[in-house]
Structure formats: C-alpha cells, structure tokens
Amino acid sequence: MDASMVPRVPHKVGVVGYGRLGQSLVSRLLAQGSELGLELVFVWNRDPGRMAGSVPPALQLEDLTTLEERHPDLVVEVAHPKIIHESGVQILRHANLLVGSPSALADQTTERQLLEASNHWGHTVFVARGALWGCEDISRLDAAGGLQSLRVTMATHPDGFRLEGPLAAAHSSGPRTVLYEGPVRGLCPLAPRNSNTMAAAALAAPSLGFDRVIGVLVADLSLTDMHVVDVELTGPQGPQAAALPCTPTERTQPSLALSLAPLLLQPSGTAYWAAVSFPPDLGSASAEFPPLPLLSP
C-alpha cells in the first residue's frame, strides 16, 4: 500500500489550564484537530467547574497525577508557572511538554529538575515565545557570539499587571512609571504572568540568560487596551563588528488582561494553535515555539 494511503495515527494532546488561552486552544482542537492529525485527550483546570458545559465530560481530567492514563504525546501548559514548578517533572515522565509560562524556568531548581527529567525519560521541553518575535534571529546572533546585551521592555495599563511580592504594593507615580528594571531572573517571581516574553528572550539567548537579559516593566496609564513590547539588541562594537551595533524594535498588540472582546484572543490563541498543530518533536517544526536545546534529551 502507498505510504500516503496509510491512515495517520493522531498525536494525542493534553491541555493544562482552561483560562482564555486554554479555552481558545481547546475549542480549535475540538473543531479542527482531526484535520491535522491531532486528538485532544484531556483538559485539566485547577477549578474544574470552569470546564462545565464547554468541555465534554469524558475529556475532563480531575486529577493531573493520572494524566498517564490518557497516553498523551504532548501536554500544553497554559495555566500558571506554579504548574511547571509542581507538575513539570511528572508530565515529562509521560509526554513532551510545551511550556506556556516560561517565567517558571527562571527558578534554577525547576530548570535543573526539568533537564534531568527530560534526559531520563526521553521527552522534550518546548517553550512558548509569547509576544517575542524574532526569536530565531536572537538565537542565531547569540550562537554566533554577536550578542552583547538584550533588553526587553513591556508596558501596559497598571490594571493589566498581576504582581506578587514587593511589586504587588507598587503604585504608579505618574502617567508612566517604571515598576522594575533589572535582570529577568529577579522579575519572574514578582510578575510571573507578565514576564513570559522576557523569559522567552532569556532562553533564546543562553549566553546572557536570565541573569544578563534585562527586563523592564512599565505601568502606562495611556495604554488602556493594549501592551507594547520593545526589544533592544546590542551587538559587538569596533571596526570588525557587524553593521548593527544597536537594534531597537517595538510591537504593539491587544492586551488580553484588559480586553473583553473575544476577537482579541486571536493573536495569542493563534500562536499556541500553530505550536500544537506543528510541534517540533512530533512533525513539522514551528517557528512560533522553538525548542529549548538544553532541555532536549
């Protein structure tokens, strides 16, 4: 029989988290997954009541520790960094893992444990790049030794932040206030939901990493329905240097935290869908979600 005539075995996907991104991803998997050889085998949420009426009961997973019973090939985390801290190792025992909350990897213990689990069980960790575009270019420049500094600034309305620790008490002192400026490693535990783009940058540039990539968090009262991400790269200086000593770029997109319009879910939801549709370890590579080489077996 012609190989093209052989039915393709669908890749089994589990989704951890049923917030806005999780809902978008689950909806598209149910509607279009079979066309791309993907089968949704479970959805887990810390509050199971949120899935009532929208996720078929047979797909609702009550206990995340029993995920192996669903035999997933890939588990997509779109919940909170705590899930990676608490359950990342267990997930890797049974499946590949797509981390939608890369700020979790700022914790060195978590990163080490995931590396060990990946090597031991032969499963791979993939990382969502979120709003970080040009991720491949950053990685190539870093690998070539041409990246001296990397700075990522994220600005949005103060109501768009979900801050913890000392930053939780931070207040805007004017129309535009810098809440944090420093190493991304220090920012991630204080703003776990608002630092994922910066964490993705730190992972894309391992020579700098979480300690040398600079993250800046800005509260801007004028940004009522969007957030703005600025990425600034600095390359080598001098006569032998590349022609691009400093490159600032900016991206503006709707803010999911503030917007009530369902259509504004599309930018992030589409990115996650692209990653699951073509997971690098399971088929065609996806530029949206480059794998984490250090966490690949």
Swiss-Prot record:
Keywords on record: Phosphoprotein
Residues where Phosphoserine is found: S24, S172
Entry GO MF terms: aspartate dehydrogenase activity; NADP binding
Pfam family, one: NAD_binding_3
InterPro entries: Asp/hSer_DH_NAD-bd, Asp_DH, NAD(P)-bd_dom_sf
GO biological-process terms attached to the record: NAD biosynthetic process
Disulfide cysteine pairs (residue numbers): none
Domain of life per record: Eukaryota
The family this protein is said to belong to: Belongs to the L-aspartate dehydrogenase family.
Name of protein: Aspartate dehydrogenase domain-containing protein
